[in-house]
């Protein structure tokens, strides 16, 4: 029945979210244990039996969070399968091409790619891709930038306008999500909320108008936003 299908999909979605959160937390632990993390321009993390269907999503989150190219690798029986996401100015496919001697195979494009690697070659791969990144990425490239499509007034921030944006979907590489800016506003009451603090709550105030905001799955960004 429809109800059974809906319940199954809801359960499956919750399990995927739990798996994603677990991998994300484990990735953060690996980062915290790496004394050379700050020096590396490319994040490469490997763990046994990470879920293949989720590592790309987590790689994307880490890429946004640290503004570094990120590759997550799940390995079994000495062979790793990886999924990577990149930042502006760093062509991930070109980087993997440069490291092809350390890889079994790879594919993808400038901002997203997949790879297979023997775990016996993982250390040399990490060294080589970071060496390449040092050559092609400047310190300026590592500073996050945001391309604004349109400035907003506080009166334009409505649910009706948000729903209108859905008419532009589907978003993707050749149809990126539009980015709007509400300038000279005050950000207040920043806090992670929800189960496991995985969502973000904040309040924006401009010209005596208050806008309550929620960012789903964005709880980890709370510490990076300043009032």
Give, region by region, the residue ranges found by the protein language model.
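Broad gene-expression machinery/nucleic-acid interaction feature
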Residues: 67, 79-81, 112-114, 143-147, ...
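Long, low-complexity segments enriched in small/aliphatic residues
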Residues: 153-205
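OB-fold single-stranded nucleic acid-binding module
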Residues: 121-127, 220-227
């Amino acid at each position: 029945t429809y109800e059974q299908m809906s319940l199954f999909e809801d359960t499956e979605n919750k399990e995927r979210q739990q798996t994603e959160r677990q991998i994300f937390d484990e990735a953060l632990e690996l980062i915290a244990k790496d004394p050379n993390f700050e020096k590396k321009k490319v994040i490469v993390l490997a763990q046994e039996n990470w879920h293949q269907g989720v590592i790309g999503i987590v790689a994307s989150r880490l890429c946004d969070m640290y503004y570094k190219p990120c590759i997550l690798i799940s390995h079994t029986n000495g062979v790793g399968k990886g999924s990577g996401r990149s930042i502006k100015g760093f062509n991930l496919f070109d980087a993997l091409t440069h490291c092809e001697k350390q890889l079994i195979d790879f594919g993808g494009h400038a901002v997203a790619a997949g790879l297979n690697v023997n775990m016996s070659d993982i250390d040399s791969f990490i060294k080589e891709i970071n060496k390449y990144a040092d050559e092609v990425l400047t310190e300026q490239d590592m500073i996050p930038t945001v391309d604004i499509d349109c400035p907003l007034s506080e009166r334009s921030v409505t649910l009706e306008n948000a729903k209108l944006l859905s008419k532009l979907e589907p978003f993707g590489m050749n149809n990126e999500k539009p980015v709007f800016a509400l300038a000279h506003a005050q950000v207040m009451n920043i806090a992670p909320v929800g189960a496991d603090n995985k969502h973000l709550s904040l309040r924006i105030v401009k010209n005596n108008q208050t806008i309550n905001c929620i960012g789903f799955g964005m709880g980890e960004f709370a510490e990076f936003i300043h009032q």
